[in-house]
């Protein structure tokens, strides 16, 4: 049997769009260790543009980055996906970049 999250694909014409920038808090432990990278989060955005669920698709374990990425996405409001002008709840993948200045 396939493992992993049971993600149903819901067709849509326009994907959800963040209303504001996704701003993760860079964990101190990762900064001190000089860890950079991209965490890919799969998120369910409901028809009101709220983030209902988050799962790590591609993470950087044991650095705090996965949690920081999910937290940042949970705090972001989205314009919901549209299917034929109707708002629909959908799963999308969102890459969150962690770059040291």
Regions found by a protein language model. Name each.
Residues 29, 33-40, 45-82, 89:
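A short, well-structured alpha-helical segment
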Residues 1-32, 71-75, 94:
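Acidic, low-complexity proline/glycine/alanine-rich linker and hinge segments
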Residues 16-17, 65, 69, 100:
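Low-complexity, compositionally biased segments
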Residues 80-101:
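Cysteine/selenocysteine-centered motifs that mediate thiol-based redox chemistry or coordinate metal-sulfur cofactors
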Residues 19, 57-58, 97:
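Residue-level detector of conserved, well-ordered beta-strand and adjacent loop positions
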């Amino acid at each position: 049997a396939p493992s992993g999250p049971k993600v149903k694909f819901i067709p849509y014409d326009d994907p959800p769009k963040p209303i504001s920038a996704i701003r993760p808090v860079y964990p101190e432990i990762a900064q001190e260790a000089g860890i950079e990278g991209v965490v890919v989060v799969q998120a369910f955005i409901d028809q009101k543009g709220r983030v209902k669920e988050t799962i790590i698709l591609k993470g950087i374990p044991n650095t705090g980055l996965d949690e920081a990425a999910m937290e940042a996405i949970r705090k972001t409001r989205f314009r919901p996906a549209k299917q034929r002008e109707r708002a629909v709840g959908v799963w999308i993948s969102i890459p969150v970049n962690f770059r040291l200045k």
